[in-house]
């Protein structure tokens, strides 16, 4: 096995889904500030937009079967999101990640991406998805030059996939992963690491990263709100994940200047 530039990030944090309430046209609210800053005075170059709270999966650590959703009339329209992105770019934002729920579960999402790219050719546009519904849109994503996809996949085992998501769609996800690779669209696998569930699959994730031009991010299992099924017996800490990876393959930390500014610690993998 040749040395690989592909990376694992054992300590990314999994942000809870969120949605934004509808508001009046942004142009009437205020004059945009010169730049965006967070509470620590750092300049914000990257924003996340949740386009929907709906999802076609029922992951045990996420919704746990809950069926209460934000009313359609309270969710931002695509036109409002376009205005929001316009304003954010005026304040120095360079990257937008579109999330859900499952963004492709919302009607017209691919058309929205096309309009966003047409309006902002230089904007770094990324999508986070569960990989089940993206297939019919991959050629469109390639045509508009989508910068990258984050694809959530916790297991390479079909039965485990159905156990955790409530849906027998593992084959569809693998098919769409292959289609993304064929289209040349960069993607990263997000895997929630859980003791007693997928810790035995660490070699499979490493092997996939070593043989494909993708990154893998291992995410700590954490409570995601009321009604989710969380147990501390399943918790697998970032240091322990990293130690397990080191037991399988050589790793080297990515230099600070190569990082994307996020909280994850990045490592390159290499092996025989």
Each PLM stretch: what is its role?
Residues 4, 18-19:
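Serine residues within intrinsically disordered or low-complexity segments
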Residues 67-75, 162-168, 230-233:
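Short glycine-enriched, charge-decorated loop/helix-capping segments at active-site entrances
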Residues 78-98, 105-215:
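Radical SAM/AdoMet-radical enzyme domain recognition
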Residues 30, 159, 168-174, 178-272:
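Radical SAM enzyme [4Fe-4S]-AdoMet core and its adjacent flexible, acidic
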Residues 21-124:
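Conserved alpha-helical substructure of the radical SAM core
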